[in-house]
Amino acid sequence: MAENRFMQSKRMAEPKTSPHEPENTCDLLVIGSGAGALSTAVTAAYLGLKVIVVEKDAQYGGTTAWSGGWMWVPRHPLALEAGLVERIEKPLSYLRRELGAQFDETRVLTFLTQAPRMVEFFRKKTALQFIDGNTIPDFHGRTPDASLGGRSVCAAPFDARKLGHRLNDLRPPLHETTLWGMGIAAGAEMRHFLNALHKPASFWYVGKLLFRHFKDLLLHRRGTRLVNGNALIGALAQSALDLGVEIRVNSPAVRLLQKDGRVTGAVIQTSAGQVSIQASHGVMLATGGFPHDPARKKQLLPHAPTGHEHWSAGNRGNTGDGLRLGESVGGVVAEDMVQAAALAPVSLVPKHSKTRALEVGSDNNHTHFPHLIDRAKPGLIAVTSEGFRFANEADSYYDFMQALLAATPAGKKPEAWLICDHHFIRYYGLGAVKPAPMPLRPWLSNGYLKRGFSTAELAAHCGIDATTLQATIQKYNAQALLGKDPDFGKGETAYNRIQGDAIRVSARGLRNPCMAPIEHGPFYAVQVVAGSLGTFAGLRVNEHAQVINPQGLAIPGLYAGGNDMNSMMGGYYPAGGITLGPAMTFGFIAAHHAAKRDPAETCIDPAPQPKTQSTKENSMYYELATMTLPFGTAAQAASQVQEFATQPEAQGELLGCWFTDIGVLNQMLVLRGFSSLQALGEERTRTQRSASPFGCGGLYQSLEQTTYQGFPWMKPVRPSAESGITGPVYEIRTYGIQPGGLQATVDLWEQYVPARDKLSPCVVAMVALDGPLRFTNIWAYDSLNARSQIRGEAVAQGIWPPKGGPAHLTTHMVSTIAMPTAVSPLK
């Protein structure tokens, strides 16, 4: 059905040409080939414009092809379908607080309005499909109106064989971030790779991917299962080519053409000489910003006084061409941003075995590896050459770099060392170094990785003060055992926790998913320096992505997108995906403006405002399964439940796994969360048809599964590592509800729970969707004594139970006290 819609859109978009039309004429000329460029090209072609894309390099895709591919798109349709509905005021308020004086309400509102339509357009009309990031939080969870999820999407895996002969023109993923050239998707897929030697299901999952990849290498000389940013570019390219867009590589733009003050095309350098391409509707500049333009870096990056002290992970061909082209016809580059670049720590990976990792003056001999996720894993710290920690290592890459710049004395080069032990590097890897069974020797030989059999020896190899480093590690180890980082708050935000590893930490009896002792030698270090994922400072534009002059007037026929457009975030970084989300959206907007079309006509808004006050946010579905087990089998059953719930074909998320302590004994309670009833139903079918439901077919004596929907005002249940909610005593209470009493109960609980929550947290309140009308609520307590004291205090203060609440309930009331098993995400 999706293919039929796509073929229909293709027919609608046949370019309007005549037999006498010159070869180098088009309606819209797009300079560049990253996400912003191809979003513009695909949308314009769908709207009926003839489009030519010219790319400076030998392969299309730009920095996007190397990226994680995530896009920040609040209120996107996948979140809406999962029941995560929010008013536009929520993300608007978050950005207003985050951006401060840089907040541009017109552009921000335009983005928040059109971004959901952009996603809906591409998934309904093109080859590009998405996966949701509904559990990915914003970077700064302490800022009011930050979200715990529902604001991110990523391109779904893409089969590059669909590109045919144009496959070889697609820029492959950054080799150092792959396994033998095979991209690995973030999230569940990455966890399978980390667990491939530890869990049979993960071993099987990884084995299948490797088999296909090696087959691809034999047949195509490269992988064809694309993920992350490579999948985004692959799907956009297929969509563009199918819509008749011409993509030319090795075709840098030399200068823009103008007539009567309007940009009408550009002169392009080709192997046969220069050619002029006329563009009747305008030109889009999307050449990737200036991450490798020394002159502009010297001007806009204070930590790069010569322009060479900044090592960007962006594509080497991004040298500021679009900015210079825009300036040549009256455009202005924004120079007042808080930061001109999307800062990130990078390590310098030698391209050749004889190249030392930090050899001065030989930048072309190194790949710039961005450290995006390793810093948050438990058992790693970052220190300066003096041996001191200076930051919360689990914070975003941008915030980490801000802290490093602040800790660097004037006149010194910003640099730090990431320190870990042998257990860490063999499980997680470090930077470009892969985990076991991949060898360490090549990295030790070329100097990228430093090793010491004691912390003093490691310090000597790195030029770090040995005494201070030893004291820093000792202090950190003590904090890790307590699960608290009083110095920098590591592990305290939802973003920190989701980047950590709660499962591995809990297996070691620790509490903080981002902290574990550094104690098992040898010890290792990789140096990181000041870098970025791209640049923020670009050509000033209006809400239509039109380039404006110093007076704020649009330059007719000229648009800027991607990193050639000044970031609407003003140099701040409030969430992952704030580069690609706006890039895709403003490309979509620019194409409509060039075609003189309204985006609302192209695609119905997939995320309308809630029409009544009864439509709430964060609706989630749950299954609570109750198994009766033989005495002494709880540990075995829990392990099998975890394996069953994390199989590749499993849907939903394991949230809680408890064993009863008071009430009906020898029962295991398993709570799983789902984004939709459809997903829950499919997983229920899988469980029931399994030869061994929950992996416990040979153990349990009875199994009962109940479907629930969370009270609509409650936030979704999250593991302890993300929510901070812990027991270890959990009370699971179920009440029958009188006919007609459901809405009154929901409303009363919404009114009374916030005050009661301050005494002990309500994990969830949820109404059963099958069987008698009833609801179940789960509370967490530190101990049985704490439960008794808190319940008494709540009654004494008059904050619980809700006044008038019992009148809506039946006499069916059941209470169970349960303790978390070792595999329970709720601890």
Describe each PLM feature range.
Residues 620, 630, 653-669, 689-728, ...:
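Glycine-rich beta-strand-turn "strand-cap" elements at beta-sheet edges
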Residues 2-91, 130-614:
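Residues forming the flavin
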Residues 114-118, 256, 475-480, 690, ...:
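A short structural micro-motif
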Residues 112, 116-123, 237, 323, ...:
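Non-transmembrane alpha-helical segments in soluble domains
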Residues 99-141:
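Long, well-ordered early-domain segments
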Residues 621-627, 729-735:
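Short glycine-/aliphatic-rich beta-strand segments at the starts of folded cytosolic domains
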Residues 633-654, 679, 685-696, 739-764, ...:
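Short amphipathic alpha-helical segments
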Residues 633, 673-679, 738-741, 780-786:
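Helix N-cap motif at beta-to-alpha junctions
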